[in-house]
Amino acid sequence: MINIDMTGEKRPLDLPYPSSFAPISAPRNQTFTYMGKFSIDPQYPGASCYPEGIINIVSAGILQGVTPPASTTASSSVTSASPNPLATGPLGVCTMSQTQPELDHLYSPPPPPPPYSGCTGDLYQDPSAFLSPPTTSTSSLAYQPPPSYPSPKPAMDPGLIPMIPDYPGFFPSPCQRDPHGAAGPDRKPFPCPLDSLRVPPPLTPLSTIRNFTLGGPSAGVTGPGASGGSEGPRLTGSGSAAVTTSPYNPHHLPLRPILRPRKYPNRPSKTPVHERPYPCPAEGCDRRFSRSDELTRHIRIHTGHKPFQCRICMRNFSRSDHLTTHIRTHTGEKPFACDYCGRKFARSDERKRHTKIHLRQKERKSSAPSSSASAQPSASGPGGSQAGGSLCSNSTIGGPLACTSRTRTP
């Protein structure tokens, strides 16, 4: 802080004042006292845009009077500007209040601050208040705030991933959903050609199963001992075009004959005929079943209905156990292990077929020692090697060798 006192008598001081800060002319017999306070403020802690070395006039006062400065005269009360940019405005102009009315016309009022919406709960201030250069109260520079850019639209949450449903019949397909409303002019909707492949096959109608369950026993068998009579609905026509005309099949599903005949067509069943009241309605098929679900599963052979679909390769199956074993080909699960070698299989019939190999090998090993043991007693019999052989003796007369053969008679 530097205090400068300048007193002069009967002559004005030749000080370079700006045009807006010119001193007031006074009579020759008055004594003027000029007092100025100049301070060099450091950089504001809250604002990093003010460069160092800038002299900021915090306050300036002109005391006028005949009495010395120590006397109590009317002086101007100066209020320092707050470092808050909201109080100083966007241009950082210091505000001063004067008590003398004759000094009001020397100072131009500072420009009004921009209307801040502090009551509306805005959390961010105008960036132009921090980017503007500091100026004094005597001069103001025209400063244009930087252009404002529209804020970008919030991006979609990356966690919201559209899921493709397993059955598009129950859920809308992803190509029909538009999260942003109507598509743009350059965007064309995807035709979704694969939707037809993902549609599951139609299931067996519940009415068909109910009719076979409730109407089969009454139509096929009338009593516990009745084995003849009508055996349920039959087909009319021939070949694959044959359809049922009975009320047990309201949807008239075509029942195709089995192209590959059974290996044992006349194989007797363990269950008596009167305990199998559900005959197959297909013409030329003599199968009968004791349970309605067995008949429903058998009818799928004639109709070709495959209601069980693999969700990995979209292959269809007529039986659920076939689908279960098929899924193991994708997952690599092999729950059936061989009891002899520990080899694992995905199907029980494969393990059963493999076990037969070990059983045949075991039979061969057990039969080999018994055959070798039975061959030894036959070789070591009475007579030894002479049995079945020829007896040769030398003649004492010097004649030729006389050989007589002797064979064993049974």
Swiss-Prot record:
SUPFAM superfamilies (UniProt xref): beta-beta-alpha zinc fingers
Chief subcellular location: nucleus
Protein family according to the UniProt entry: Belongs to the EGR C2H2-type zinc-finger protein family.
Protein name: E3 SUMO-protein ligase EGR2
Compositional bias (Basic residues): 353-363
UniProt keyword Ion transport present: no
Swiss-Prot/TrEMBL GO biological process terms: facial nerve structural organization; positive regulation of DNA-templated transcription; positive regulation of myelination; positive regulation of Schwann cell differentiation; positive regulation of transcription by RNA polymerase II; protein export from nucleus; protein sumoylation; rhombomere 3 structural organization
InterPro entries: EGR_N (IPR021849), Znf_C2H2_sf (IPR036236), Znf_C2H2_type (IPR013087)
Region ranges (Disordered): 68-95, 101-120, 127-151, 217-286, 349-410
Function: Sequence-specific DNA-binding transcription factor. Plays a role in hindbrain segmentation by regulating the expression of a subset of homeobox containing genes and in Schwann cell myelination by regulating the expression of genes involved in the formation and maintenance of myelin. Binds to two EGR2-consensus sites EGR2A (5'-CTGTAGGAG-3') and EGR2B (5'-ATGTAGGTG-3') in the HOXB3 enhancer and promotes HOXB3 transcriptional activation. Binds to specific DNA sites located in the promoter region of HOXA4, HOXB2 and ERBB2. E3 SUMO-protein ligase helping SUMO1 conjugation to its coregulators NAB1 and NAB2, whose sumoylation down-regulates EGR2 transcriptional activity.
EC number: 2.3.2.-
Biological or metabolic pathway of the protein: Protein modification; protein sumoylation
Motif HCFC1-binding-motif (HBM): positions: 104-107
Listed Gly residues bias regions: 222-231
Post-translational modification: Ubiquitinated by WWP2 leading to proteasomal degradation.
Record field: compositional bias (Low complexity): 68-83, 127-143, 367-380
Keywords of the record: Acetylation, Activator, DNA-binding, Metal-binding, Nucleus, Repeat, Transcription, Transcription regulation, Transferase, Ubl conjugation, Ubl conjugation pathway, Zinc, Zinc-finger
Zinc finger boundaries on the chain: C2H2-type: 278-302, 308-330, 336-358
Gene for this chain: EGR2
GO-annotated cellular components: cytoplasm; nucleoplasm; nucleus
Quaternary structure and partners: Interacts with HCFC1. Interacts with WWP2. Interacts with UBC9. Interacts with CITED1. Interacts (via phosphorylated form) with SFN.
Entry's localization field: Nucleus
